[in-house]
Amino acid sequence: MAPAVAGGGGRRNNEGVNGNAAAPACVCGFPVCACAGAAAVASAASSADMDIVAAGQIGAVNDESWVAVDLSDSDDAPAAGDVQGALDDRPVFRTEKIKGVLLHPYRVLIFVRLIAFTLFVIWRIEHKNPDAMWLWVTSIAGEFWFGFSWLLDQLPKLNPINRVPDLAVLRRRFDHADGTSSLPGLDIFVTTADPIKEPILSTANSILSILAADYPVDRNTCYLSDDSGMLLTYEAMAEAAKFATLWVPFCRKHAIEPRGPESYFELKSHPYMGRAQEEFVNDRRRVRKEYDDFKARINGLEHDIKQRSDSYNAAAGVKDGEPRATWMADGSQWEGTWIEQSENHRKGDHAGIVLVLLNHPSHARQLGPPASADNPLDFSGVDVRLPMLVYVAREKRPGCNHQKKAGAMNALTRASAVLSNSPFILNLDCDHYINNSQALRAGICFMLGRDSDTVAFVQFPQRFEGVDPTDLYANHNRIFFDGTLRALDGLQGPIYVGTGCLFRRITLYGFEPPRINVGGPCFPRLGGMFAKNRYQKPGFEMTKPGAKPVAPPPAATVAKGKHGFLPMPKKAYGKSDAFADTIPRASHPSPYAAEAAVAADEAAIAEAVMVTAAAYEKKTGWGSDIGWVYGTVTEDVVTGYRMHIKGWRSRYCSIYPHAFIGTAPINLTERLFQVLRWSTGSLEIFFSRNNPLFGSTFLHPLQRVAYINITTYPFTALFLIFYTTVPALSFVTGHFIVQRPTTMFYVYLAIVLGTLLILAVLEVKWAGVTVFEWFRNGQFWMTASCSAYLAAVLQVVTKVVFRRDISFKLTSKLPAGDEKKDPYADLYVVRWTWLMITPIIIILVNIIGSAVAFAKVLDGEWTHWLKVAGGVFFNFWVLFHLYPFAKGILGKHGKTPVVVLVWWAFTFVITAVLYINIPHIHGPGRHGAASPSHGHHSAHGTKKYDFTYAWP
């Protein structure tokens, strides 16, 4: 039996595919079946029926926060007359909603807080501060923005949805007894741009995990896009293809999890529940040795290539000053980027390259050889076929805008169309590997369900390894993935976040959905006039939204429209007739069949090179109406947005064990630049023609709100910086945001803060995250707002006003510290950047402000401790949120907390002592009579102020 998969993003650590109790989990974190041996694999088919029935009870829920949606009201419901318990009539995934005991209070509290906040703002408007009108006006604007941004963030969370794939039903419908499958084809795109900054071993592990995934071999094709065009990347992939002939059969024989070799061999224990434990131990020892040799070859490739090239250049009589070519192992010159770059062989100037490392496998199973002297591993009962693997380095020429990752993805889309043309595409970053071998099947469940023909893409959450245990900079970001994205699944679906996303190919070609229903699974009738049939696609009865698919006609009979079989003029797709001919075949293939695999011949490869040419996209729709959208550094968000405004939906797929795992930048500088890139891209979308304010009426109203929030959140920096500095400075100036609070002020403030905390508790509950993660998320939000968000606003304003392009460096995945001594050494390596200036200033201002307040109380200028305490508490609230930032720029691991506290205390004491002992700072008032009440003058003419402050 295959490893069980369940939704919930880690909430169900021990559940089956439908949330039912699964077998006891191994200490490695995977279900027992993930470590089962050949005996378990061999018996899976014979016991499939019992396993399927046991794993797939509709409505079976094992989580206290979720309950199954009433299928009679869902767009995933079986047609009338279906038998509830019949396996063939069960959907391939089930939908859950939050229990009313959590959802109803959650919605009510949002309404209550909105009213309380409105009354609070009204009170603030009515009670002006005549002594500092600029302060009053600015604070009102800030409070209004905070309330507005909170509402933008909260409204899309009114209807969270959880979907759980049923892999048992999927296997029953699509897998056959002879080992073949009728699952649709799947092209997997992996992108890399620099084999130095993005370690080539990580890329190789990503490729190996894809080749070993549990998906029909003849339906799975892997494409690697190398934007550097370097021979190092190609030869590393060639080595990976060789090692895959051993690694992939080993994974299949013993049902290994995870199937990235680096992660697998790093497991502290390797429990095995099969019958052939001794054989497994011997096989594992052999494979481990081969993997160590493989890593040694990968790490030595750069030296080997340079040495080989020097030898060939010397043999060719290349003189000093002449271009020195980089040579392949077969004695031919590399057509891409050379080690010593020269004309036509630079990173931005080289020919296009398409090389097939592993060709299309046959449809029939191919068993491996038995154990022998030359082959110590017995693969006689294992299918040893490997998926197709293709290396692509698109052509680059000076004067052609290559559009970074978006351009690479579009080039891969065209190249894959002429080579494999699978109806579905999965994209992964090179530092992400498949952690759960069932991930591809789990994602495809959401593409093959009833009414799933309107689903454009399935987004998986991003999970990371190598993050420090305290997650100092909120790299996991589960509040966003398991909270926001899961909530959006109750509307039109989650946004596209750049990696771990499964696409329907035709959505990238500009096709529109066959139907439009913006209501979502729990509100199928929401949208009224917006829910309608756009056009009828062949193969589907359009009599009702829940119609079941009927036998589809051949792809060649796709309905002909204004532009033939294409949704827009042929010239919009480029000059390749071969590519244009693939579009109708991919436009609506039967979900129950896949195109026959065809060997990639020389003509097909030549065509793939042609469609990846640097000038191919000129005067076409690529980057605007077709493919990944250009014009922003966050091409992912705007690409998903363009699909949503056409009426397409998306789905969120969170399974356990996690589908994909990547590497996160744990260094503060790299993390800030990563957030700067994201926030800059969001603002670029806001100031472009893709502004969600002007999207089509096919966008769900609350989905539009979510996109507005995504494209405007960096503006928070302008108001947050004001609120994190002015209150502290008020201790020095004596002018405060609120001078005379009343009882109603405190009542409104208490309700606003209290409801916020309760809402956070409820959200933490249904999202399955911890309170600690919620706090960490808030802390890094403060750091990012004071640094990266502000920089993003300044950069985009500069771009809009002065028409200057924005460029970013590639986020480095290489550690700066000594990982052997400390795996988190990179966390505390200080790399100075201008993004750190603002948070440092805010920290100093709040420490100094608190010290001045303390000094004024000791000096007798202020006599009301309680009033001072409120402001000092807010200052320390700011410092608490910036503590991870301070910890990152001071000291070493384990010593940092002491260093930070000592510096804070030192600055505080020095400021207080200076204020008390330097007369000209505070004037002569401290030697006069006792301080009078607020608003009056002392005997020496110094005006006194009581302290009060409004929480933002």
UniProtKB/Swiss-Prot annotation:
InterPro entries noted in UniProt: Cellulose_synth (IPR005150), Nucleotide-diphossugar_trans (IPR029044)
Enzyme Commission code(s) on record: 2.4.1.-
Enzyme class of the recorded protein, top EC level: transferase
Active site, renumbered: 227, 636
Keywords: Cell wall biogenesis/degradation, Coiled coil, Glycosyltransferase, Golgi apparatus, Membrane, Transferase, Transmembrane, Transmembrane helix
Gene3D superfamilies: Spore Coat Polysaccharide Biosynthesis Protein SpsA, Chain A
Family per similarity comment: Belongs to the glycosyltransferase 2 family. Plant cellulose synthase-like F subfamily.
Protein name: Probable mixed-linked glucan synthase 6
Species of origin: Oryza sativa subsp. japonica
